[in-house]
């Protein structure tokens, strides 16, 4: 599971639409589907129930959602902390 897969999962979970999520992520729908399929394969669970007209989270998808949100938020917070530390180091060395 990687950061990009988490972002793809979270975006599809929010939009419940692969085409809309792909547009939002500036990628193609097949590329987005590949990321979701890879995540599903790694977790050995279907995360979305797909029909020709609807997308819905499965029970596994609903179970993953709060953890994916926490993980992604943690990644963003870690980046911010490192960036802040890096900026502070440059200020004190000047």
PLM segments and residue spans:
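Short alpha-helical "packing" element that flanks the helix-turn-helix/winged-helix DNA-binding module
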Residues: 8-9, 64
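Alpha-helical linker/hinge and terminal dimerization helices associated
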Residues: 42-43, 64-84
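Short helix-boundary/capping micro-motifs
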Residues: 12-27
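A short LG(V/I)-centered, amphipathic sequence patch enriched
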Residues: 40-57
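Single conserved hydrophobic/aromatic residue that forms the stacking wall/gate
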Residues: 86-89, 93-94
